Amino acid sequence: MRGIILALVLTLVGSQKFDIDPGFNSRRSYLYNYEGSMLNGLQDRSLGKAGVRLSSKLEISGLPENAYLLKVRSPQVEEYNGVWPRDPFTRSSKITQVISSCFTRLFKFEYSSGRIGNIYAPEDCPDLCVNIVRGILNMFQMTIKKSQNVYELQEAGIGGICHARYVIQEDRKNSRIYVTRTVDLNNCQEKVQKSIGMAYIYPCPVDVMKERLTKGTTAFSYKLKQSDSGTLITDVSSRQVYQISPFNEPTGVAVMEARQQLTLVEVRSERGSAPDVPMQNYGSLRYRFPAVLPQMPLQLIKTKNPEQRIVETLQHIVLNNQQDFHDDVSYRFLEVVQLCRIANADNLESIWRQVSDKPRYRRWLLSAVSASGTTETLKFLKNRIRNDDLNYIQTLLTVSLTLHLLQADEHTLPIAADLMTSSRIQKNPVLQQVACLGYSSVVNRYCSQTSACPKEALQPIHDLADEAISRGREDKMKLALKCIGNMGEPASLKRILKFLPISSSSAADIPVHIQIDAITALKKIAWKDPKTVQGYLIQILADQSLPPEVRMMACAVIFETRPALALITTIANVAMKESNMQVASFVYSHMKSLSKSRLPFMYNISSACNIALKLLSPKLDSMSYRYSKVIRADTYFDNYRVGATGEIFVVNSPRTMFPSAIISKLMANSAGSVADLVEVGIRVEGLADVIMKRNIPFAEYPTYKQIKELGKALQGWKELPTETPLVSAYLKILGQEVAFININKELLQQVMKTVVEPADRNAAIKRIANQIRNSIAGQWTQPVWMGELRYVVPSCLGLPLEYGSYTTALARAAVSVEGKMTPPLTGDFRLSQLLESTMQIRSDLKPSLYVHTVATMGVNTEYFQHAVEIQGEVQTRMPMKFDAKIDVKLKNLKIETNPCREETEIVVGRHKAFAVSRNIGELGVEKRTSILPEDAPLDVTEEPFQTSERASREHFAMQGPDSMPRKQSHSSREDLRRSTGKRAHKRDICLKMHHIGCQLCFSRRSRDASFIQNTYLHKLIGEHEAKIVLMPVHTDADIDKIQLEIQAGSRAAARIITEVNPESEEEDESSPYEDIQAKLKRILGIDSMFKVANKTRHPKNRPSKKGNTVLAEFGTEPDAKTSSSSSSASSTATSSSSSSASSPNRKKPMDEEENDQVKQARNKDASSSSRSSKSSNSSKRSSSKSSNSSKRSSSSSSSSSSSSRSSSSSSSSSSNSKSSSSSSKSSSSSSRSRSSSKSSSSSSSSSSSSSSKSSSSRSSSSSSKSSSHHSHSHHSGHLNGSSSSSSSSRSVSHHSHEHHSGHLEDDSSSSSSSSVLSKIWGRHEIYQYRFRSAHRQEFPKRKLPGDRATSRYSSTRSSHDTSRAASWPKFLGDIKTPVLAAFLHGISNNKKTGGLQLVVYADTDSVRPRVQVFVTNLTDSSKWKLCADASVRNAHKAVAYVKWGWDCRDYKVSTELVTGRFAGHPAAQVKLEWPKVPSNVRSVVEWFYEFVPGAAFMLGFSERMDKNPSRQARMVVALTSPRTCDVVVKLPDIILYQKAVRLPLSLPVGPRIPASELQPPIWNVFAEAPSAVLENLKARCSVSYNKIKTFNEVKFNYSMPANCYHILVQDCSSELKFLVMMKSAGEATNLKAINIKIGSHEIDMHPVNGQVKLLVDGAESPTANISLISAGASLWIHNENQGFALAAPGHGIDKLYFDGKTITIQVPLWMAGKTCGICGKYDAECEQEYRMPNGYLAKNAVSFGHSWILEEAPCRGACKLHRSFVKLEKTVQLAGVDSKCYSTEPVLRCAKGCSATKTTPVTVGFHCLPADSANSLTDKQMKYDQKSEDMQDTVDAHTTCSCENEECST
C-alpha cells in the first residue's frame, strides 16, 4: 500500500507544471547585456542607410512589493551612415556623453507575473531617457496563459494596446521554455501615434488595414529557465519592422528595422536599496510624447538664446538673397520658423523693435511667425494687429496664414477668438471674412482631436449667426454659414435650421443663395451625425414648394453622406413623381454618374444607384444642356491603391438659358484615406439683366400701364419678382473654405460702367497710362510656408520613428518700368492721344519662384537625427530686360533686348535622396551618404563579361585595406560610368538660333535604383536633375542686340522689301503693285515652293552624329532620314503622281473626294492587275522611269517603285499614245519631288485615280472575272452594277470593305447569288458605311454609255478644274498684300546679321476665306522654310496644312474638314494626314497614341482592329437626330465607333433631302453654322388652326372661345415690355386676329377678305410693300410671304409672323423664364407647362387656355364670358357624409342675361362642405381658390354665348 501511495505522489508531482510566469527574486540582482539598433532605408542591400545603435549593461535588483531597480551602466551610442552592410557603425562620443548623463541615476519599475507596471524616474529626467527605458522593459513584458500554448490577445506595450499572438514550447528535459510573441502594430485598440497636418484627411470606409501606407510588426523570442525559485528570462531577442510604401507597391517600400538583444550574464545574491532621490511616476510601458515635439528633422539648431539666433539668421537671409535665392535659403527660413516656435512673446517683441523699420526683415519675420503656429507667436501677431503696426496687405496675409497653420489646442483657441473679434478686424469686411474662416478651421482641427467639442469654441460663430439673422444682414448670414460649414460640428445644427424653410416659417423670405449655403454647411456635420442630417435633407428634396436650386443642393449633400440603399430608393421615388424637370434631371444624372464609379469604397453606393435607376424613366438620360446635371469621372489604380475623382455640378435656373451655378471639385484617395483637394463654385443671378440692360424707359410708355391694367383681369396674376443681380464665388482647399467673394448689384453696375465707358473717360486706363509714364520700380519677396505633415510612432527601442514632409515656397519679383511718350502727354489727356503717339518703354523684370520639398523617414530626437531624406526643389527664373517702341498709328512694334551673354537657367529641377545623420554635439556637421552609391552593384543581367586577367587583377586590388576609397581615379570612374550606364540617364536637346546668338537647351541627368526593383520608389531614389537653360552660341560676328519687329497693315509689304534691300525703300513706295508683288515672291522664294519643275532638290543623307546632344537648328537643313514608316507614304505619293494626267500642273478636282482607303487598296492591287494582264509599251517605259527616279530618291524608296510601276501601267493604258507619253515624261521628271513630299502630288492623284478607274475597266475585263469570287463588299439601298469592272476596282470592294448607303454603286458583277444578296440587305455596323462628300452633289457624275461617257466626263471635269484653278491661286500674295510681317534677327555693329521672317497673308472678306503663313530664314545660304495654309475651299470643305524643311518640302501635316452624308445622315468628316514628320514628333505621337484605346473605352466607344492607311486618321460625326450623333474614328490600326452619342444641345438638322433634289450651292456650313446653332437655341411659339406649340415645345390642341382675347405671350417681368393677344376672327376657327402692345404702339393684325389688315395705333396701313420702322421703340414691320413680320429685339421679340392663320413668335435667349401666357414661361419645364396666371398648374389644356382669357366689362366688348366659382350640381358623400362641393378654381360662364350655345367639359377640383352647413357667403368671401381640394369632377365650361338680355352694370 505504501508503494502504491508513493507512486501516485510521484506521478502527481511529475505531471504538475512549474509556474512559468517570469519574475525576479527580490533577494538577488541580475546583470544583462543589452543592445538595440535601428536602421532606416530601402529594404535592398548595398544601398545607403542611416541609423543608431545603443549598447549597455543592465543591472536589475529587487525591492519589496514587486518593485525593482534598474540601473543602466556603460551606455554606448554608435551611429551608422553608409552603405549597408559594407560600412561599420562608428562610435559617437558626443551622443554617448549626452545619453550617459541621464542614465547615471536609477530607475524603478513594478513587475509581476511577466507584466510591467508603473515606471519611476527622477523628476528632471528627459522624456527621451524614460522612453528608452520603456523600450528596454518592454522586452520583459509577457502574458502567459498556463492552460494554452497558442493563443491571441490584445496586449499593452510600448506601442499601445495591440494584437499579440503567443506560441509556447516547453523543454522539460532541460527545464527550458521558449516563447514566441508577435505583435501586429496595424491592429491596435489604442495605438500610440501622433500626426500633425493631417486633420483634413479622413479615412475611407473600407478595409483600412489593407490600405495603409505604413505597416508594422514586432517579433519577440524568449528563452526562460525554470528553477525552484521561479522562472527567469535568460535571453530575449526582438525584431521590429515598419515599412512605408508611398505608392502602395509591394516591393517599393522604405523600411525601418529595429533589433534588440538581451542576454543574462550574471545573477548575484544581493538586494537593492531604495534610491535616495525622489522618484516621479511616469506611467506604464505606453510611450509618451514630450509636451513639445522635437524640432523638424531637417536640421539641429541650438535653442538657447533664440532672440539672438533669429536676428542673426534674418540678417544672413536678407544679405545673401538680394539678387537671387541662395542655396540654403529654405533651410535658413525653416530655422527661423523653428526658433520662433521656441521663442516667447517677449523675445519676439524685442526682435520686432529691432526690425520694424526694415521692410525686408519685417517680411521674413512675419512669414516665419505666421508659420510657427504657437501660442506665443499668436499673441505677438495679435498685438501687432491691435497696435496697427501692419498695413492692410500684411494684415491680410498674416491673419490668413497664421490661422490656417496654427497648432489648434486649448491654449491657442481663446487667443484666435480674441483676434477674430478685435476692432481692427471687424472694421474691414475682407479682414473679418478671412479671420472668421480661419478661426472656424482652427475649431475644426481642434475638435477633430477630441471626443466632444467645447461650447466655448463654437460660441463666437454661433453669435455671428444669431446676430445676422436677427438683423437680416445677408452678408453676415453668408459668412456665418460658411464658418459653420468649416467647423462641421453637430452642435451647430440648430443654427443652420433657422435658415431653412422646413423648420422656420420666416426662412421662406431668406434669399435662395443663403438657403443653399445653409444646406452645404450640413455636409461636414453629416460625417458625424449622418442620420439626423439625412432626415432634414430628404424633407427638403421632397418638398416641391421649395426652389429647385435648394432641392438640388440637398440631393448633392445627401450623396455626400453615403446613404444606404433604402434612402437612395426613396430619392429615386421622389424623382419618379417629380414635376420639376431640373430636379429630376439632376437626381438622375447624379445617380447615373455614381453608378459608374470604380472606387472600392463607393461600391455600396454604386450598386444601390444601379438598382434605383431602374425605377426612373430612361428619358431623363436624354435631357439637354438646359437641365441641371452632375458630371462625374473617377479612376482607380488597384495596383497602387490610389484614385482620383472629379465632379462638376451644373445647376440651371428657369430664368436663364445658361447655368446659374457651377461647382467643381477634385478629390484624391490613397492608401485608405480621402482628401478633398480643391473645390470651386461660381453662382450667377440676374447677370443677364445687367449685361443686356438697355436705356429704354419701358415704364414711361403708355402700353406699360395698359399691360398692367390688363393683368388685373387675370385671376391671381402677378409680375415676376425682380431678380437681384449677384455674382458669388468661393474656394475650398482640403475641404475648408478659405475665401469667397460676393459681387452685388452696385458693384456689378460699377464694373459694367467701367467696361462700357468710353475710353476717353475711363479712369482705370488713364491711371495705368499715368503710372507707366511716371515709371514703376520695386522689389517684392514673399516666403510662404506651405505646411508640414508629420506622423510619429514609437519604435521598440523607445526612440520615435517619424515620417515627415515639409514644403516651402519663395516668390520674388523685381520690376523696373519706364515709359516715354512722343509727343508728351498733358496732365488731362484723352485716350485718343495714345493712338497718335509713339510710346517707348524700357523695362527690367526679374520674376523668380523657388519651391523646396523634403520628405524624411527616421529617428528624430532633440539630441540626434538619423533619417532618409528625399529632397526636391524647383527654381524658375525669367529675367526680361527689353526696350519696346510702339507706334500705334503706323501699326509698328519694335522690341530690342540683349543677347545671351551668359548662361541663364530658366527652370531647374533637382531631386536627391540621402541617408543623413546629425547630433547635437556636432552642430553644423552633417553626415550624408547617397542612397544610391556610385559603386552600387549591378543586376546580374547587367554585369559585363570580364576576362580572367582583368578579373584577377580586380580581385587582387580588392584585397587591400583601402579597396573602397571614396575618391576614385579618373580611370576607375570611367569604368564605373560604363558599368552603371544602364541606370544613369543623360540627355541634352538644344535648339540653336545662330542668327540671334542664343540656344535654348533642355538637359536631363538621372541616376536611380530601378535596376534593383522596377518600382516608382526605386525610380525616385537617386539623383535627378532637369534644366531649361538659355545659353550663348558662337557666331561669326558678335551680336550686340536682338530685335523683334512686327509690322501690321498696308505697310507690311514695303517693310518686307526694305528688310532685304534697304536701298529700295524710296523706290518701293512709287513702284506699281505688280513690281512689289514680284519682289515679294522673289524674297519669299514662292516660286521654288509651289512650282512642280523637272529639276527638284535631291536630299542628301547626312550621317547622324553620335552623341547625347540632339540639335534642332533653325536655318540648317534637318536630317533627311528615310525610315521604313515613311517609305510607304512616299510610295503612295509616288504611285499616285506617276499616274497623273498629261498636264503636270493640273489641280485636283474639288468634287473628286475619293476615300483614301480606296486609294490604298487600289495601289495594293494595281501590281496584281499588272501581273495578270499585259501592259502596253508606253506603260512599261513610264514605270521604268518612275522606278529609276525612285531609286535615286532614297535607298528605302525601292519598295515604292514597284507600286509606282503598277499604278503607272494601269493609268497609262487608259490614255492615247500622246497623253501616255507625256504622262510618262511627267512622272519621270517629278517623281523624285513627289516621293519626298506628298503635297506635290496630292493635287493630281485623285484625278489620275479616276482616270485609271474608268480606263482599266476596258483593258482588264479578264482579270475582273478572275477576281470576282473574292469580293466581300456589302451594300444597302439600290445597287447599280456594270457588267464588268477592273481588278483594281474589284480589289477596292474586298479590301476596304466599304459600305454605302443610299444609291450605292456596285463595282462588281450584277449576277450575284442569293447568299450575297442576304448579306447586302442585312444590317451593317456603323463603321462599315462610307462617308459621301457633299460637294459631289454639286457636280454629279454623269452616267453615259461606253467610251463616250468617259471622254465627255473627263472633258467636263478638265474644263471645270481649269476654271477652278484659275480662280483659286496657290499663292495668296498674287491677289492680296500681306497683313502682317514679323522679323527676328540679331544686330552687330548696327548691322543686321540675319534671322527669321514671318509673313501672313489673309483674305477674310472673301466668300472663301483663306490665310497663309510663311516663315523663312533670312540667311542667304539657307533654304529652310515653313509654310502654313488654311482655307475654306467651298461651302462644304475646309483644308489646312503645315509644311516645313527645304523649300517647305521635307515634312508635312495636313487636315481637312468636309461636310456630307454618312449612313444617310448629315455628317462632317475631319481627316488628318502626316506623309512625313520628324522622328521626335512621331515618337511623341506614338506615346500619346498608346492611351487612345483606353480613353475611348472609358468614354464608351467600341473598337475593332483593322488595317487603315498608316499615315492617316479620320473622324466622322453623323447627326442622327438634333440631339444624337454617331461617331466613327479610323486610326491606322484600329477603328473606334459609338452610336447615339448624346449632344448637350440641339443642332439644326432638317429632314433628309434626296441627292437628286439638292441644288448648288448647298448650305455653307462654315459661314452659317454658328449663327444657325444660336438661332436654334432661341424659343419659338406657334399657333396654327387649333394646334399650339409652346416655347418649351409642348404641343396641344385648343379651340378658342369666340370673340375673347387670350394672352398669347407677354413679358411677365417688372418691365412689362410687350404683350401679344390673340382671338378667333369671326366664325372661322382657322382665322385669328392679334393685338400687340409694345413700346408706344398698339398694333392690330386681322384677316379681311383673304388679306391681312394692319393697324398701327388705330390707323390702317397699306398692305403691299410695307416697311414700317419706329426708331423710338426699335420696331420693324414688313411684308413676308402672305403676311407681316414684326421685329423688336430691344423689347424681347426677335420676330413675330402673322398671316391670318398662323402665328409664330421667336424671343431672344435673355427672355428665358420671363414670359407667360399660352406660349408658356420658356423655362424648359415641360411637365409644368400648363401654368395658370395664379401660379398653379391647370389639369388640362382647356383649363389652361381658359385661364388666359381676358374678361371684358359687360356690354363693352365682344367677349361675353367671365369666370366664376361653381357649385357641383349633385350631392356627394365624403367619408360617409353627404356634402355639397364648390370649385376651387373658376370656370367660364356666360355673362348675366346670356345663355351658352357651346360648352366644353373641363376637369375641376372641388372643396366640399357638409350638406347641412349654412353658407351665406359669396364666392369672393369664401375664397374657394384658397381652400383644399377634396375631389375632382367634370363640369361644362361655356365657350359661346347668345346675349339677348345682357345685363349691363352701371
From Swiss-Prot:
Specify the signal sequence span: 1-15
Q: Does the record's keyword annotation contain Calcium?
A: no
Keywords recorded for this protein, A-Z: Disulfide bond, Glycoprotein, Phosphoprotein, Signal, Storage protein
Record's Pfam families? Vit_b-sht_shell (PF09175), Vit_open_b-sht (PF09172), Vitellogenin_N (PF01347), VWD (PF00094)
Q: Could you tell me which Gene3D superfamilies the record lists for this protein? A: Lipovitellin, beta-sheet shell regions, chain A, Lipovitellin-phosvitin complex, chain A, domain 4, Lipovitellin. Chain A, domain 3, Vitellinogen, beta-sheet shell domain, Vitellinogen, superhelical
Locate the compositionally biased regions of type Basic residues.
1267-1277
Q: What processes does the entry annotate via GO biological process terms?
A: cellular response to estrogen stimulus; response to estradiol
A molecular function GO annotation: lipid transporter activity
Note the SMART domains from the entry.
Answer: DUF1943, DUF1944, LPD_N, VWD
Q: How is it modified after translation?
A: Phosvitin, an egg yolk storage protein, is one of the most highly phosphorylated (10%) proteins in nature.
Q: Basic and acidic residues compositional bias: what residue ranges?
A: 1156-1165, 1338-1350
What is expression of this protein induced or repressed by? By steroids (estrogen).
InterPro entries named among the record's database cross-references: Lipid_transp_b-sht_shell, Lipovitellin_superhlx_dom, Vitellinogen_b-sht_N, Vitellinogen_b-sht_shell, Vitellinogen_b-sht_shell_sf, Vitellinogen_open_b-sht, Vitellinogen_open_b-sht_sub1, Vitellogenin/Apolipophorin
Composition bias, kind Low complexity: at what positions? 1122-1143, 1167-1266, 1278-1291
The record's disulfide annotation reads: 1581-1719, 1604-1755
Task: Enumerate the spans annotated as VWFD domain.
Answer: 1579-1756
Pinpoint the Vitellogenin domain residues: 24-662
Known tissue expression: After incorporation from serum via a specific receptor, it is cleaved into four fragments, heavy and light chain lipovitellins, phosphovitin and YGP40, and YGP40 is released into the yolk plasma before or during compartmentation of lipovitellin-phosvitin complex into the yolk granule.
- What PANTHER family does the record point to? VITELLOGENIN 1-RELATED, VITELLOGENIN-RELATED
Q: What does this protein do?
A: Precursor of the major egg-yolk proteins that are sources of nutrients during early development of oviparous organisms.
Query: What is the designated name of this protein?
Result: Vitellogenin-2
Q: Which organism is it from?
A: Gallus gallus
